[in-house]
């Protein structure tokens, strides 16, 4: 176990330095830390107002994130029709066979899928398309990397640039927790998962931003750069370690697919779950995330602007949400946040970090993960440890839900039906 004096940075023995009275007096400005929100799709003038125009005031009060007057238009590369027609032709064909081809020019026609969402025969055909897409992806990965993926597993996709605020580390800590559970109990009936990481550029240049470097010294920026590089190295090492471990074979798999592999369409077509887990306070609205939605990929997401927007589209019962919202993150940072306490008091977090500290997953160079540990237990600006327990619980719910094939398929169909 790590000694607290190495990482505590002088903050007292609570997760948050604030009294109940102080919390009750939290200034309203914490509810709107970003006043300049990017809507990155030409459809914004149609889709977003449709969500809020009936009761705009109520929606803004609920989100406390932004108002329509503060939205800045930017030219995106968001084309849901093309993502489905060229990226997932099997699913596009099934949809056309079911509701006709008018949806190609009128996306709102996808709503005609709603009454079909719980139809057993249609669900069976939907799952057959997904399974065929999984096999295509598996073949491509095997040909390019020599890796065989389990096509009967839940394919869990995180396809974003590997940078701090996208929080691949949150995903990794949970993967290590699952690994530890299997090692502690090799007979554990765990849902098989294939975790696919891809380091790709966003669909548009302005959709995501990171404010975390402003006003910080170079050494802090260098620490984050080192941590990002170490995260990529750790992902690749996890893939090798898991592949060689008979205890996790067929249960857990990690795959890294570089952008150069050209498999973006295949990954979205095959995925069951997409991880949109960026730090809530660090993201602008990014409508390129509709690429997963229109492929019927269910999302697990943090409580940021994009994920709230998508939740309104697909319905809260058809996605998974967790963690701290923007005002809560702002509150933590204003009143003091000590990540070490999460390491100290939560065994799952401590066990996962101790694996990293021991160099278990990086045997060739145990020091690789040092910058990751420094980042997590030093300042943890991306609130990875603060969100971890919420995230792990939500992922457990994902596993339980995926075992119910009919209800999961219905969620997938409703995701597509919500795009308009």
Task: Map each language-model feature to its residues.
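Catalytic cores of carbohydrate-active enzymes across secretory and cytosolic contexts
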Residues: 1-420
